[in-house]
């Protein structure tokens, strides 16, 4: 996801420096070229050799290292960097960067960088909450740095409070949001639905389907990475919530309808990827239904057709896309759905096609519009998500 990107990781002298090694490793696994620059104090907590083994690149500490190629190294590094992140950032380094001090390799390089810059302060709670530190962080924000708020918990000093460096996985999400994709959805509001619904029979049992939510979650993440403000209305899934996405958890088809109806008026693009129940029990038992020797018939009633509602109540300029899971006559049924629902695009797939079933990480999608049919090959759901978004914004 970060192939072709150069990430500059600045490591300063705090106990959380060990987490920077895990961050470097994670970025390398995402195919980024990771350059590391350390303060001398940072080398007291973790050795440059650790980062060199993880990244396959020489670590910079000394501004006047005579072993580097003949060039102004901090300028050369700043020019080829796509993003700089300082993690952990001590109070001292935050102060230096806020006031333009450049007395070592890290601060000198940071001053020369014109790429997106992230900083993750990590320190004792009292130091973090000190008005001087807060003023310095606000200055950094004014100068274009994105400040990643520290986590709360037990600190190395024994105190409990705010000041922990976030976990590497969270830091990676900030980096991905900043540089992983072009921001062609910046300024757009995108509403996604995902997952199954559950229609209760009694306090114990419910009617549901096999949807894992993976496709909808992939679309939500892709839209976020492309700069959109994303709202995800999701049924029950086992998938962690995507970073930087507003998540609305629902259970039943009626709950999904109410959430979608509330969010839809402000959305520029709506993609309904959820597998919503078409029918729900007419009556929900107050207590667990006991089995008997006779057969059981459960009367069902129609749920609200959410996609049709969206098509009938769209605002001007709004793009609406639905999904169609079929087992036969996929194109014919999906074209009919496109017309009947009054939407702009149907993303159709065939449950019987290899790689396109429930719960898998791939999909085979056909994008159907009023005047076009585009057959996508077998792809990862992440790549399918990007293809859907690209087609949608062209409508």
State where each predicted segment sits:
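A cross-family phosphate/adenosyl-ligand binding-site feature
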Residues: 1-118, 124-213, 217-395
């Amino acid at each position: 996801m970060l192939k072709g990107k150069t990430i500059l990781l600045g490591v300063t002298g705090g106990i959380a420096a060990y987490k920077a090694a895990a961050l470097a490793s994670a970025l390398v696994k995402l195919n980024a070229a990771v350059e590391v620059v350390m303060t001398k104090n940072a080398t007291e907590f973790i050795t440059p050799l650790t980062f060199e083994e993880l990244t396959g690149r020489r670590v910079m500490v000394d501004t006047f290292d005579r072993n580097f190629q003949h060039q102004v190294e901090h300028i050369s590094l700043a020019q080829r960097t796509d993003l700089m992140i300082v993690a952990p950032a001590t109070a001292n380094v935050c102060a230096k960067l806020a006031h333009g001090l450049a007395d070592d390799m890290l601060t000198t390089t940071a001053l020369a960088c014109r790429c997106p810059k992230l900083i993750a302060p990590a320190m004792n709670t009292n130091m973090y909450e000190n008005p001087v530190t807060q003023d310095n962080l606000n200055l950094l924000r004014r100068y274009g740095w994105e400040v990643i708020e520290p986590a709360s918990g037990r600190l190395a000093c024994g105190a409990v409070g705010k000041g922990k460096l976030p976990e590497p996985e969270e830091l990676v999400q900030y980096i991905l949001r900043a540089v992983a994709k072009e921001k062609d959805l910046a300024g757009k509001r995108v509403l996604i639905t995902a997952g199954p619904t559950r229609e209760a029979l009694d306090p114990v049992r419910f009617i549901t389907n096999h949807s894992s939510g993976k496709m909808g979650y992939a679309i939500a993440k892709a839209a976020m990475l492309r700069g959109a403000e994303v709202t995800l209305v999701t049924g029950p899934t086992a998938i962690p919530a995507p970073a930087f996405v507003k998540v609305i958890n629902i259970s039943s088809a009626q709950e999904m309808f109410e959430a979608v109806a509330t969010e839809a008026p402000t959305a520029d693009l709506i993609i309904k990827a959820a597998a919503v129940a078409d029918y729900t029990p007419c009556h929900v038992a107050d207590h667990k239904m006991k089995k008997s020797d006779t057969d059981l018939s459960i009367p069902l009633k129609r749920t609200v057709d959410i996609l049709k509602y969206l098509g009938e109540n769209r605002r001007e300029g709004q793009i609406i896309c639905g999904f169609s899971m079929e087992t036969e006559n996929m194109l014919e049924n999906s074209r009919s759905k496109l017309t009947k629902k009054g939407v702009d695009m149907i993303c159709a797939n065939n449950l019987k096609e290899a790689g396109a079933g429930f719960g898998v990480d791939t999909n085979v999608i056909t994008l159907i519009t009023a005047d076009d049919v585009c057959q996508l090959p077998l792809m990862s759901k992440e790549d399918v998500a990007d293809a859907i978004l690209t087609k949608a914004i062209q409508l």
